[in-house]
């Protein structure tokens, strides 16, 4: 599914372009846009590109909101309905192949719930709608990001998943365990 194309079509067909417009593109389109003067810039993406956006906005003192990712935890307590929480966390993490800014990146839970959580999570990922063979399976945005993700994996800590294909830009839903804040993935 070409989500950005669908969004651009819907917005550009229904809003006055003087008010709101979606422009799809790469580096050249982004550079052309950054040369323009705007009332406000809202950017979601990498730190590296965020710095470029901010520097360009400074030329006109344009207000900027940067959403540059980060790490979003999910916290589970002893009182939680674990099966329900696992279902919701897996959905939230793997929608759009985890490429959403609020996707949970790690789980904080009592040690006593760890194994049950892992078992339930692996079973949830095994559902057909998460299958890599599914025609609607979402691709990672580009090969560079597939390589970036692959470099973050510590094979010794992969509980399930971890497979990827650079050519098709598909990365299996992956769960790692015993991860510390010193690991590359964090």
Regions of interest found by a model, annotated:
Residues 1-18, 61:
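Conserved small-residue-rich beta-alpha loop and adjacent elements
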Residues 4, 21-39:
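A structured beta-alpha segment of the ubiquitous adenosine-cofactor-binding alpha/beta core
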């Amino acid at each position: 599914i070409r989500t950005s194309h669908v969004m651009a079509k819907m917005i550009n067909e229904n809003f006055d372009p003087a008010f709101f417009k979606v422009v799809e593109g790469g580096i050249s389109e982004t550079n052309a846009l950054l040369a323009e003067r705007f009332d406000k810039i809202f950017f979601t993406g990498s730190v590296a590109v965020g710095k470029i956006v901010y520097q360009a906005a400074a030329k006109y003192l344009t207000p900027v909101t940067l959403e540059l990712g980060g790490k979003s935890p999910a916290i589970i307590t002893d009182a939680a309905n674990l099966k329900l929480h696992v279902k919701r966390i897996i959905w939230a993490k793997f929608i759009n192949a985890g490429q959403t800014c609020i996707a949970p990146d790690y789980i904080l839970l009592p040690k006593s719930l760890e194994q049950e959580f892992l078992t339930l999570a692996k079973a949830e990922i095994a559902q057909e709608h998460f299958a890599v063979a599914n025609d609607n399976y979402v691709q990672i945005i580009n090969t560079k990001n597939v390589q970036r993700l692959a470099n973050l994996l510590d094979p010794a800590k992969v509980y399930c998943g971890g497979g990827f294909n650079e050519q098709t830009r598909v990365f299996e839903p992956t769960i790692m365990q015993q991860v510390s804040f010193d690991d590359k993935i964090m």
